[in-house]
């Protein structure tokens, strides 16, 4: 019976399920272990990848930020001004300085009289330029030309605003030094006639300096080169600026040609002197010839002064021209408004239109007054 029961129990389905359930659960657990390990490894790998990516992203972002910072820093430093803007600024300043010089000259003429101020035109010009300089550069502001072109003076290589000693130095080299040199050169040439060659060297040196400016655009004037002051832009310049290299090259060619012609003429003159000295044979006669040459140079300087006086007379003749015929006035006639014309010109004008040609004041032939011994 027991055997039968055991057999029956063994073949009973519920018993089989109960007996197999523990083994089945353990098998399921064992079978489920490898997948969990694989999933954990995959998760760990994914976490490591995320960490690596998160570590790389800040580095890339930092590099991009550094590049942007470098670009921004490069934009913080303004660029140097170019030749066209510097020339335009200088021309604008010269225009306003000329107007101011004329006004100062008229004011001084009324105060001191025309005879006194005509002999001191250079001093009146220096006074006007000094006032213009004190009202602009000396107080640290821009000149009218610099404002027009958005330029600013700075110390080269430091990008700092010029200090008061730098401005005083610029004023001395720009205004006082040329005035003192111009006043002292005639006396220097009288004492040392051999230094007369400086009068021809200085203009060539100035043209050479101008050629260098056309090449590199650094210093337009000697005063700014000696005081180490340059111009920068107040605005951002995106477009390319034109260059004046061709003008600099042409100036250098002109300087070389003029120097060659000058040396050629002097060498020919020296050869003639040597030949004349060989024929004479005495050293004392050579010294006399040299003294004669020095006297000739002094006479040339006197002739040059006379030529300057003639030029001044020509300017006065230009002021005495009639505004209608543009020639020197003949039989000078004054109108009621005070303008001067030729008698023939103003009478013909009054026959057509009874108005002054200059100010349109009503006039007639009866009111025109001829000026005798004028």
From Swiss-Prot:
<feature type="topological domain" description="Cytoplasmic">
    <location>
        <position position="113"/>
    </location>
</feature>
<dbReference type="InterPro" id="IPR001841">
    <property type="entry name" value="Znf_RING"/>
</dbReference>
<keyword id="KW-0813">Transport</keyword>
<keyword id="KW-0653">Protein transport</keyword>
<dbReference type="GO" id="GO:0008270">
    <property type="term" value="F:zinc ion binding"/>
</dbReference>
<keyword id="KW-0863">Zinc-finger</keyword>
<dbReference type="InterPro" id="IPR013083">
    <property type="entry name" value="Znf_RING/FYVE/PHD"/>
</dbReference>
<dbReference type="Pfam" id="PF04757">
    <property type="entry name" value="Pex2_Pex12"/>
</dbReference>
<keyword id="KW-0472">Membrane</keyword>
<dbReference type="GO" id="GO:0007031">
    <property type="term" value="P:peroxisome organization"/>
</dbReference>
<feature type="topological domain" description="Peroxisomal matrix">
    <location>
        <begin position="217"/>
        <end position="243"/>
    </location>
</feature>
<feature type="binding site">
    <location>
        <position position="337"/>
    </location>
    <ligand>
        <name>Zn(2+) 2</name>
    </ligand>
</feature>
<feature type="transmembrane region" description="Helical; Name=TM1">
    <location>
        <begin position="83"/>
        <end position="112"/>
    </location>
</feature>
<dbReference type="GO" id="GO:0061630">
    <property type="term" value="F:ubiquitin protein ligase activity"/>
</dbReference>
<feature type="topological domain" description="Peroxisomal matrix">
    <location>
        <begin position="1"/>
        <end position="82"/>
    </location>
</feature>
<dbReference type="InterPro" id="IPR017907">
    <property type="entry name" value="Znf_RING_CS"/>
</dbReference>
<feature type="binding site">
    <location>
        <position position="325"/>
    </location>
    <ligand>
        <name>Zn(2+) 1</name>
    </ligand>
</feature>
<comment type="similarity">
    <text>Belongs to the pex2/pex10/pex12 family.</text>
</comment>
<feature type="binding site">
    <location>
        <position position="359"/>
    </location>
    <ligand>
        <name>Zn(2+) 2</name>
    </ligand>
</feature>
<dbReference type="GO" id="GO:0005778">
    <property type="term" value="C:peroxisomal membrane"/>
</dbReference>
<feature type="binding site">
    <location>
        <position position="345"/>
    </location>
    <ligand>
        <name>Zn(2+) 1</name>
    </ligand>
</feature>
<comment type="subunit">
    <text>Component of the PEX2-PEX10-PEX12 retrotranslocation channel.</text>
</comment>
<feature type="transmembrane region" description="Helical; Name=TM2">
    <location>
        <begin position="114"/>
        <end position="135"/>
    </location>
</feature>
<feature type="transmembrane region" description="Helical; Name=TM3">
    <location>
        <begin position="166"/>
        <end position="181"/>
    </location>
</feature>
<keyword id="KW-0576">Peroxisome</keyword>
<feature type="compositionally biased region" description="Low complexity">
    <location>
        <begin position="35"/>
        <end position="76"/>
    </location>
</feature>
<keyword id="KW-1133">Transmembrane helix</keyword>
<feature type="compositionally biased region" description="Polar residues">
    <location>
        <begin position="1"/>
        <end position="11"/>
    </location>
</feature>
<feature type="compositionally biased region" description="Polar residues">
    <location>
        <begin position="18"/>
        <end position="31"/>
    </location>
</feature>
<protein>
    <recommendedName>
        <fullName>Peroxisome biogenesis factor 10</fullName>
        <ecNumber>2.3.2.27</ecNumber>
    </recommendedName>
</protein>
<feature type="transmembrane region" description="Helical; Name=TM5">
    <location>
        <begin position="244"/>
        <end position="263"/>
    </location>
</feature>
<keyword id="KW-0479">Metal-binding</keyword>
<feature type="region of interest" description="Disordered">
    <location>
        <begin position="1"/>
        <end position="82"/>
    </location>
</feature>
<dbReference type="Pfam" id="PF13639">
    <property type="entry name" value="zf-RING_2"/>
</dbReference>
<feature type="topological domain" description="Peroxisomal matrix">
    <location>
        <begin position="136"/>
        <end position="165"/>
    </location>
</feature>
<feature type="binding site">
    <location>
        <position position="356"/>
    </location>
    <ligand>
        <name>Zn(2+) 2</name>
    </ligand>
</feature>
<feature type="topological domain" description="Cytoplasmic">
    <location>
        <begin position="264"/>
        <end position="374"/>
    </location>
</feature>
<comment type="function">
    <text>E3 ubiquitin-protein ligase component of a retrotranslocation channel required for peroxisome organization by mediating export of the PEX5 receptor from peroxisomes to the cytosol, thereby promoting PEX5 recycling. The retrotranslocation channel is composed of PEX2, PEX10 and PEX12; each subunit contributing transmembrane segments that coassemble into an open channel that specifically allows the passage of PEX5 through the peroxisomal membrane. PEX10 also regulates PEX5 recycling by acting as a E3 ubiquitin-protein ligase.</text>
</comment>
<feature type="topological domain" description="Cytoplasmic">
    <location>
        <begin position="182"/>
        <end position="192"/>
    </location>
</feature>
<keyword id="KW-0962">Peroxisome biogenesis</keyword>
<comment type="pathway">
    <text>Protein modification; protein ubiquitination.</text>
</comment>
<feature type="transmembrane region" description="Helical; Name=TM4">
    <location>
        <begin position="193"/>
        <end position="216"/>
    </location>
</feature>
């Amino acid at each position: 019976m027991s055997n039968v029961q055991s057999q029956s129990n063994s073949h009973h389905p519920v018993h089989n399920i109960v007996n197999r359930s523990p083994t089945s659960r353990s098998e399921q657990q064992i079978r489920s272990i490898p997948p969990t390990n694989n999933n954990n490894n995959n998760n760990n790998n994914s976490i490591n990848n995320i960490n690596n990516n998160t570590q790389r992203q800040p580095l890339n972002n930092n590099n991009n930020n550094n590049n942007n910072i470098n670009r921004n820093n490069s934009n913080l430093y303004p660029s140097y001004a170019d030749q066209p803007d510097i020339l335009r600024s200088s021309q604008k300043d010269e225009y306003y300085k000329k107007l101011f010089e004329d006004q100062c000259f008229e004011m001084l003429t009324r105060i001191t009289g025309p005879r006194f101020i005509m002999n001191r035109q250079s001093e009146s010009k220096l006074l006007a330029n000094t006032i213009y300089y004190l009202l602009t550069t000396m107080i640290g502001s821009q000149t009218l030309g610099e404002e027009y072109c958005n330029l600013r003076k700075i110390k080269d290589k430091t990008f700092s605003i010029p200090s008061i000693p730098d401005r005083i130095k610029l004023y001395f080299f720009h205004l006082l030094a040329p005035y003192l040199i111009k006043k002292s050169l005639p006396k220097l040439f009288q004492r040392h006639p051999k230094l007369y060659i400086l009068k021809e060297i200085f203009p060539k040196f100035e043209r050479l300096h101008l050629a260098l400016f056309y090449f590199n655009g650094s210093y337009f004037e000697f005063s700014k080169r000696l005081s180490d002051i340059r111009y920068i832009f107040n605005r951002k310049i995106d477009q390319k600026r034109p260059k004046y290299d061709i003008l600099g090259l042409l100036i250098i060619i002109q300087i070389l040609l003029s120097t060659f012609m000058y040396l050629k003429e002097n060498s020919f003159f020296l050869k003639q002197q040597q030949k004349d000295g060989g024929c004479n044979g005495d050293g004392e006669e050579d010294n006399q010839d040299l003294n004669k040459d020095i006297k000739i140079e002094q006479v040339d300087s006197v002739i040059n002064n006379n030529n300057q006086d003639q030029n001044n007379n020509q300017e006065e003749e230009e002021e005495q021209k009639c505004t209608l015929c543009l020639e020197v006035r003949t039989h000078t006639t004054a109108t009621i408004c005070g303008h001067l014309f030729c008698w023939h010109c103003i009478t013909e004008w009054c026959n057509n239109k009874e108005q002054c040609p200059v100010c349109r004041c009503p006039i007639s032939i009866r009111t025109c007054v001829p000026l005798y011994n004028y």
